[in-house]
Amino acid sequence: MKHLISTLLFAALGAVAVPASAEGLDIEVSGIGDAPIAGLKLYSSRFSYPDQPRLTERSGVYDGNAEFHFDDLAPGDYAVVVWADKNENGEFDRSMFGNPKESYMFSNNVHEDEPDWDAVRFTIGGERTQLKLVVSKP
């Protein structure tokens, strides 16, 4: 009976443990201006970019700056786009011709309408990853 309780306790603790391979990502964004919200889309593979982000987040803007923090990301290649969400709709708005309507920046501080995955990808692995992006007008 004692062995059964020990086994069950050990199994329960193992079920809630965070995987050792989980990594973190911190992103500092500046140049947002007077937009009240910054939006971010995080992509986790070449195949999902740019149409299917792994997640979309929003952050409040203070003095033209915003921060995003992510924990428990699997090691690998990622890309992000951040934008000044002036109309607070949670979307990276584009014109009917596909051009960005809001100030934005991709990872690696790439400022193109639709950059290639290789231009914007960065690798998470080892230590916590830090990105600093400066939003620019379209």
PLM regions: where:
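Short, acidic Ser/Thr/Gly-rich low-complexity loop/linker segments typical of extracellular
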Residues: 50-63
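N-terminal signal peptide c-region/cleavage motif recognized by signal peptidases
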Residues: 17-19
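A short tyrosine-centered beta-strand micro-motif
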Residues: 78-82
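Acidic, glycine-anchored loop motifs typical of Ca2+
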Residues: 85-94
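A short, amphipathic beta-strand motif
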Residues: 24-32
